[in-house]
A protein has these predicted regions:
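Acidic, metal/ion-coordinating pockets
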Residues: 1-257
Length: 257
């Protein structure tokens, strides 16, 4: 099975890149499943129901989120019914949505888990305290389990990779918008990368206009960030796995628009 995971979609340029390229990529790369982190789709922070439906219609099979999950107030009611969108599982259970979902891709089931790190993030349970139960629940449905670890600290993501080595098909880091060079298959057949990168404008400061971002640092004053527009790319990882859920290959993915 060939699974493409696309990293943080940033603003309108990232959404347009998915909308304009994913259908052809699915055909040209012979993809069976596409999972997209849509955490920054709405002007760089959060996701709206309209944008979620647009990304799914463009060819995404499942969307993951992160620390900006509640930035758009209309997303809460949507998450109650949206079975193909997951929010961090280690948030309070009483909040809308789910942190684990199982999607059907043809005749194959794929489980998708979303986790949120602790360092510099909104309050949440430790992702390590909930993930074992989630993995067990996923395995009752399918051996193919993809885990999106949305976290700032590289140590948290690396540790989760080792914690799930041999138990998840892939442990894929998101959030920093900078693709790391450590893509590999861990012992036991778990594809891993510390950060899968960003789908959006790379002539930017991690997606935002450079001049606005620079004013935040040079003036030390809050600035309302706006998505940049230049050098738009789709970034992520391409995972190949067998029916047993073990990854046999993984490679970093980058496609310029």
């Amino acid at each position: 099975m060939r699974i493409l995971f696309l990293a943080d979609v940033y603003g309108a340029p990232g959404v347009a890149a998915i909308d304009g390229n994913l259908r052809s990529l699915r055909a040209n790369l012979d993809l069976d499943c596409v999972i997209v982190n849509a955490e920054n789709a709405a002007d760089g922070a959060g996701l709206t129901p309209k944008l979620a439906e647009r990304l799914l219609a463009a060819g995404a099979d499942c969307l993951t989120l992160g620390n900006h999950v509640w930035r758009r107030k209309e997303i809460g009611p949507y998450l109650i019914e949206a079975t193909r969108v997951v929010r961090p599982a280690n948030l309070l259970d009483r909040l809308p949505g789910r942190g684990l979902t199982v999607i059907e891709v043809g005749e194959v089931k794929v489980a998708v888990i979303n986790l949120l790190g602790s360092f510099t993030m909104e309050p949440a349970q430790s992702m390590f305290s909930v993930v074992d139960q989630l993995i067990d629940a996923a395995h009752r449905e399918t051996p193919i389990v993809i885990v999106d670890v949305h976290a700032e600290a590289t140590s948290e993501k690396v540790a989760m990779g080792w914690h799930l080595a041999g138990r998840a098909t892939a442990v894929l880091g998101t959030h920093t918008h900078v693709q790391t060079s450590d893509v590999r298959v861990l012992p036991g057949g778990t594809a891993y990368i510390t950060d899968a990168g960003m789908t959006g404008p790379h002539d930017s400061v991690i997606g935002a206009k450079k001049d606005i971002s620079l004013r935040r640092f040079t003036l030390q004053q809050p600035q309302r960030l706006e998505p940049a527009s230049g050098d738009v790319r789709l970034e992520g990882v391409l995972v190949t796995c067998g029916d047993d859920g073990r990854a046999t290959a993984v490679e970093a993915f980058r496609h310029s628009v």
